[in-house]
């Protein structure tokens, strides 16, 4: 189409092009009179007043005031469309400049402003690296404009492409735009301006684009000086001269003088006086903000009028700025007023020109509250995009469906009112997560939402928005579009949900996708998901803000709305990924939110993947395994907040769950999953629950919650647990990781789904996978089709699994490791009650994912309870499941062997980052040491339960085939990761790695060797454990350890080594050091059996 359209601009617009050339010649495009031109090439874009007075529109009979009004209406249409498309404010500003420059050479009578608004935004989105689909741009325009003529989509698309070509030619392909906002922020920092002054200056910079044609007359630095100068006048703030006796603006632009600033101020005030009432109210509100809190309070009267305006400006420019809840409530009257104004404008407008509906719709939507939010999202700050996506996504979720949008709008008022502050906060916070800069932005946004009366726009908010956020934001919105269509159904549900989480989820939905994309861009960016999770106390992942990961809640608390941000950072999950899942989990229902805390890392990523799947499954799926590896290493260090969550992200990378076997093994009945399932859930869940953050192996950093197993109601309480159930596979560490990685890859399902799929899929929850969220439709055999995902999500939301959450659930056969493993490892059941221990215990008692009910009991209490309870439960579980496990193990062993061999090969190639190449069967390590014990230095012995399948030749063959690469090579790799994150533990890991390698090839012998190393390394391990009880995530390296426990004292060290040093790090020194004999049978129940297990091999 572009080819067809390209010639047309010349032919079809012969008159327009001639007029353009005439305008150029008439206006003397190169204007020498202007002193503000930094470079000759820029002269063409700056015009004198005389030249502007003789513009093409004027020559066509349009009055000066009318032309200015058209420019203003077009700018607001672009603003609204940009917010709907969830592009950054930077992108919107660029589109507005394109529009101003275009109409300096063309008449409004030749090119309708609504058409050029779409073309400008379409082009600016590409230029600012936030491309939007033609279809989405057209839909956004149709939503923002009143229904005029029902044009064919093909016609609209061709017209847009044609107009884009005309625009590009008019601009001479000079598409790089410098904005005054950058200079405003920089100058405010230079003069150390107060927050109000900085915010007002920033607003004025946006207003100069929306209300005036200053961008055609003065360079950005001059406009920035004017904005600060006027803000100083309004706020009665005086910027003193420098020590050199020069005015502050001299340091911004040497050509600026006080006279010029006064002239610009007069011009701006004159335009302000002429502007419609709605614009005046907006400026009044800005002025009030500048004048201080007292004025702000008084300004509340104006807020209804300015409501959409300031919020719009703020949304447009600051994602942080969310409409205050009170503003959201008074939308109806304002909407009516705006409708009347729009009618008047239509009457005034020439019949040829469409009314400026763009502005009105904007007002309305903003009034709706969602629109405001979305406009915020439009803000350059990534955070804004998130917030807008939360509000806006629902509006524009598919972005496309007008119905959805309308519905959302209608629901928005009540919806926003219910949880306006938390929702806004979460949305802004989500945005903040998009980038580090965004975080600042989101914190400001959270503060703004907290202080509805006054939009908080920290000076840095622009930076954040302009820096990372645009890309992340822009990208996310785009992703959102794709994903929104998939998640649309969910979003509507979210809207109705009174929970802030619902609102958050919608924000997340949009935001999550953005983040997932952004995450790719910023793999190391702080995880946004946590941001969304903690932001709303309700939303905080398990429904308990503080409980979610222990680590997560505290950071959020500091931020208020941003809490989740810090939490996410702690988790180390990719911000996008995390946010994504989070929002989706919200969509699923608050139930998922409950699990969210634990799944924040796990579930969110899965959700992110789900979103991705919905939007584009293939986008992430191929990369999942690699991504997992990378993110794990990256996130492991990141997560170490002293909280278990940090290691969890690495676990995600491992995606132990993703092994095909897990998929194969029915995980739906989590309680009675196959031995595989039992093993996987047991180890990983525990580790994931409390130790997930502690151990990299434990993949997700699930807050200690009730069992994750119940996908339904209880998930909320112990989302971490559900994560841990799946984690058992992951925790089993590397072996699981290998097997489950495939499965997870196959089913990158949100954690909620995973929980249900847990039975079915096993570790889908871990798919999240820090850096890249592969779509849920991983190719490993788990179906990730949107329908399947939806059904899974629904199931996960169901409280039917609540019973599973109960501690007894841990004892369920499905969760338990094979009988052989159970004998050595009676602890699994105990883990349940060792909630405090759960971080370690959950890893140790891999078989008892249910037991992962990881309450927030203190480590000491948990240790005691866990030791006694875990032993009892383990014994019971062993007897109950021995027979089942044995039969299951036999069949699964063969499958696992195959998968393990393949995976081990891949992993060995991958550099051992995935020690999980060991047997698919989750090595169940029952580590009785609670977090406290880890911290204390491994007071408790480590219990590793290794299913026979794992010990079997399958594992060995895989390990043996790759012993050097996996056993030894991986341990070092893991050790490296561990060393970075764990510190003292790192030294221990390499030896363990060696031991692990040995164990994989020759379980018993290597156990002995590793046991020696254990003793030598115990001190190291103790120190590392003390320092980082959260390193459990590294239990991924526990694969070897598991065998060793079976094999003997060396088991613990081997675990860490075989599983990839992380295990060793995670395992308390005592656990690692304890020889098989040393490991109390009660604690491990593994010491005596380990050797037999190897023999079974």
Swiss-Prot record:
Function description: Regulatory subunit of the cyclin-dependent kinase pair (CDK9/cyclin T) complex, also called positive transcription elongation factor B (P-TEFb), which is proposed to facilitate the transition from abortive to production elongation by phosphorylating the CTD (carboxy-terminal domain) of the large subunit of RNA polymerase II (RNAP II).
Biased composition (Basic and acidic residues): 332-350, 652-675, 860-870, 884-895, 1016-1031
InterPro entries membership: Cyclin-like_dom, Cyclin-like_sf, Cyclin/Ssn8, Cyclin_N
Subunit structure: Component of the super elongation complex (SEC), at least composed of Ell, Cdk9, cyclin-T (CycT), lilli and ear. Associates with CDK9 to form P-TEFb.
Major location (coarse): nucleus
A GO-annotated cellular component: cyclin/CDK positive transcription elongation factor complex
GO biological process, one term: DNA-templated transcription
Species name: Drosophila melanogaster (Fruit fly)
Family of this protein: Belongs to the cyclin family. Cyclin C subfamily.
SMART domains membership: CYCLIN
Lineage: Eukaryota, Metazoa, Ecdysozoa, Arthropoda, Hexapoda
A GO term for molecular function: cyclin-dependent protein serine/threonine kinase regulator activity
Disulfide topology: none
Biased composition (Low complexity): 373-390, 420-456, 467-478, 489-511, 592-606, 687-698
Gly residues bias: start-end ranges: 993-1007, 1037-1050
Designated name of the protein: Cyclin-T
Localization terms from the record: Nucleus
